Amino acid sequence: TVNGILDNLDPHSVYIPKADMARVTEEMKGDFVGIGVSFYTYKDTIAVIRAIENGPSAKAGIKGGDRIIMANSDSLFGTHLKDGEIIKKLKGAINSKVKLKVYRRGEPKLLNFTVKRGKIPIKSVDAAYMLTEKLGYIKVNRFAESTYKEFKSGIEKLETLGATEIALDLRDNPGGFLGVAEQIVDEFLEDDKLILFTKNKRGDIEKSYATSKGDFEEGKVYV
């Protein structure tokens, strides 16, 4: 049974029904249509983590830290709403519009925004550039399907520019595919170095080690 399988996994593993799988994985691959925000449910409201750069919400003026209270005439606060229901109210056909009421700290009244839904490109690496002659900077905002490829491209660019040290910025990164995160860590570690270990509910431990030579094993890394 599903519950029996979960008993052998780690305490953070949950079962995702088939009907919800497309929604859960959508933001981890390709483009999708929406308002362009990353959010989490805080207590009984929707808290915006960030508005995706150049996305519909960012263009409309929505910012990280905002709380979305209403979408059109639908209430989006209260403990009764699940993430799936919230997403259904925020998503819609491309070029359709949604009127949002937003609470912003420091503002005396709710703010009104009209957001035109659009195609949101999913980029995992926001930036890769040199801070000094030796120090390169790379910002990874999630661990999605395309992240490793984007990361490799960024690292190669920085090495070409002379980087011998890397500042890896993971702020506001909500996570994603564990295997992709392992691939990235592997680029910094020598062969057979421990990357991570997982411990299931029965206490069984599984370890993952660095494999082949990484692209940045010799330089310093700051996270």
Predicted segments, located by residue:
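Extended, small/polar residue-biased N-terminal targeting/export presequences
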Residues: 2-49, 95-99, 103-127
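Cleft-lining beta-strand/loop regions that shape enzyme active-site pockets
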Residues: 47-50, 58, 63, 72-74, ...
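Structural motif
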Residues: 65-67
